[in-house]
Amino acid sequence: MVPVVALVGRPNVGKSTLFNRLTRTRDALVADFPGLTRDRKYGRAEIEGREFICIDTGGIDGTEDGVETRMAEQSLLAIEEADVVLFMVDARAGLMPADEAIAKHLRSREKPTFLVANKTDGLDPDQAVVDFYSLGLGEIYPIAASHGRGVLSLLEHVLLPWMEDLAPQEEVDEDAEYWAQFEAEENGEEEEEDDFDPQSLPIKLAIVGRPNVGKSTLTNRILGEERVVVYDMPGTTRDSIYIPMERDGREYVLIDTAGVRKRGKITDAVEKFSVIKTLQAIEDANVVMLVIDAREGISDQDLSLLGFILNSGRSLVIVVNKWDGLSQEVKEQVKETLDFRLGFIDFARVHFISALHGSGVGNLFESVREAYDSSTRRVGTSMLTRIMTMAVEDHQPPLVRGRRVKLKYAHAGGYNPPIVVIHGNQVKDLPDSYKRYLMNYFRKSLDVMGSPIRIQFKEGENPYANKRNTLTPTQMRKRKRLMKHIKKNK
């Protein structure tokens, strides 16, 4: 088994900074105020070629109420999952009562625990860590995570001895970030191969929406465990959380994202960075579930987020949450509003669910698989050209400057989303209405559902364009005689 290392401690002691340092990413949000990390987050790290899984957790200080209580529960769950615990303290702040409470809990769990004193830059390390020996956790490892000082020594003295006793593991099945990056790279490489099998890869599924529409509740309902902090306050998820799972024999990487709100309401840099990571999660996903609050209806921000999903070319499933408890009259009004405002998204399935009670959730994955299969289906050049020919026979292209636009052949230009490349003459002059006609014709003929389809046009090149033949001496003499004759008859 690959070792699992949990970073625990009070809020704002530098756990996320060390997490980013170990995983060589910026996957954990970092800012100078307590309570920023709310869920436990997994990342892949290695030392001297040996891999381990690092878990970043929310802080525990013993004064939690509301959502902070749930953050503390996530931290305690991370301790149970871990093989090794790095207990981090703040050397600048000194020993705090919360540090003593955490140390007491760690001793009761009998987990291998190592005490790490962070923020020792500018201090005498030996003097700064003296008070922490009273915690009774043995040797103290002073580091400055923000600058990387002492981190390598920590790895060599703490983690490497543990990993030398473990055989390298070839398959990592719990590290979601590893899955996401590895499969994205593998997807990009294998798409160029004829024997590419999209069914062999996990489906990366992002759950997005405005704050407090029930994304994390839906994630937990799907997983069957309280994996993501859920609390009735907008913005309790600030990071994008990658979670591997399996359902009906198919593997998935579930991405629970931070809520995206109106730009004017994004008041601090942390939330702006969370929005960026949400948009990056959409780019990384194969299929996106857009969660909409049935009680609040379609907002401009929902449409803005929908536009980003479409521009990214991602497959889409629309989920209308909080459907329970609504009267039949209100439900009809919501459906009419959806038809009116989302009429241009005719390819996406719409599901009405209650994530809290689980009604309608079981049917979501049928649409997810349908959308993924549509976006990754391989179609040959002969089939695409035949469909294009049928479309032209049913409805001829318009005349452009007195000449009919000629479409010659079509072939696949990419997948996820499906791209059809059409070659012909004067295709750049085709009106948008005819391009939409072709797109809809291909969608109907290929039975593409849940995924956008894109059509690109390539103009046939004239090999003689901008070229002039040089005249032979005989042709030059004829040309001169002709020019004389023309001048003489003027």
Curated annotation (Swiss-Prot):
InterPro entries given in the database record: G_ENGA, GTP-bd, GTPase_Der, KH_dom-like, KH_dom-like_a/b, P-loop_NTPase, Small_GTP-bd
HAMAP family: GTPase_Der
Domain notes: The 2 G (guanine nucleotide-binding) domains are essential for activity and function cooperatively. The KH-like domain is required for ribosome recognition.
Source lineage: Bacteria, Pseudomonadati, Pseudomonadota, Gammaproteobacteria, Enterobacterales
Consequence of changing residue 15 to A: Complements a disruption mutant, KM for GTP 695 uM
Residue span(s) of domain EngA-type G: 3-166, 203-376
Self-association state and partner proteins as the record states: Associates with the 50S ribosomal subunit in the presence of GMPPNP, a non-hydrolysable GTP analog, and thus probably also in the presence of GTP, but not in the presence of GDP or in the absence of nucleotide. Interacts with YihI via the last 490 residues.
Record protein name field: GTPase Der
